Design a protein with these regions (language model features):
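Short, flexible loop segments at the rims of nucleotide/cofactor-binding pockets, characterized by
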Residues: 32-38, 62-64, 83-85, 137-141, ...
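Residues that mark the start of a beta-strand
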Residues: 53-54, 159
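Active-site neighborhood of phospho(di)ester-bond hydrolases with catalytic His/Asp-centered motifs
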Residues: 57-60, 81-91, 107-110, 139-142, ...
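Zn-dependent metallo-beta-lactamase
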Residues: 1-52, 188-199, 209-218
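Core dinuclear metal-dependent hydrolase active-site scaffold
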Residues: 26, 47-50, 126-155
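Active-site HxH/HxHxD metal-binding segment of metal-dependent hydrolases
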Residues: 37, 42-43, 60-130
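Metallo-beta-lactamase
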Residues: 7-11, 70, 100, 104-144, 146-218, ...
Length: 218
């Protein structure tokens, strides 16, 4: 009998997801909401992957320096302990404070560099960039032209994807499209990530579970 899958979501309810070899810690939960003046208040999520190496995914706005230092310090880390910094895309609420990590390998969208040396890697061909066993960066464009996400295997929740603004938040259906440079492409990669992930960490909201239910097709 053929089956069809149905997906629902559920808040994780925690900023810490333990794992082996890597645990995932949201050290700042992103947000975005309109203010009284018709503008938008927003800042991106900042996520630490801690295992054999320390990996920081997105670095917030320029004024998030204190948040980053405090978040790292809470895990016994200093900026010089961070081996990789991944910025999922180039918007200002995701790339602030890169100057804190001059020793790290930095990935911003499809660029991979160590100081002034740009490493050859073809994200456009669909090749993931392996940081370590169980941790890789892969292309998820649509919100911008060259977004990336980070996949972490082996956590207590299963596979976690730190997705940047591929997902604004858990309940973003109908609101992400006006922010997208290519909604059709973004929708494709949203579906792909939902099929891969047990938990998604969005760019502007709390982590949420992706629950795949299979039921007989009529």
């Amino acid at each position: 009998m053929s089956v069809a899958s149905r997906i629902r979501t559920q808040p994780v309810g925690s900023s810490a997801i333990r794992g082996d070899p890597y645990s995932v810690f949201v050290i700042k939960e992103g947000y975005a909401y309109p203010d009284r003046d018709g503008n938008t208040k927003a800042d991106g999520s900042i996520t630490l992957l801690k295992g054999r190496q320390a990996v920081l995914v997105d670095t917030g706005n320029p004024w998030d320096k204190g948040v980053i230092l405090q978040g790292l310090g809470g895990h016994g880390l200093e900026p010089e302990d961070v081996s990789f910094v991944v910025c999922t895309h180039g918007h200002s609420d995701h790339v602030g404070n890169l100057n804190l990590f001059p020793q790290a390998t930095v990935i911003v969208s499809y660029d991979v560099c160590r100081r002034d040396v740009y490493l050859s890697h073809d994200f456009r061909a669909g090749l993931p960039f392996k940081i370590d066993d169980g941790v890789e960066v892969f292309a998820t464009p649509g919100h911008c032209g060259s977004d990336v996400s980070v996949l972490v295997r082996g956590t207590e929740e299963g596979t976690v994807v730190v997705a940047g603004d591929l997902f604004e938040r858990e309940d973003d259906e109908g609101s992400w499209q006006p922010l997208s440079e290519n909604p059709e492409l973004q929708a494709k990669h949203r579906d792909r990530v939902r099929s891969l992930a047990d938990v998604i960490i969005p760019g502007h909201g709390a982590p949420f579970r992706v629950i795949k239910e299979r039921e007989p097709a009529l």
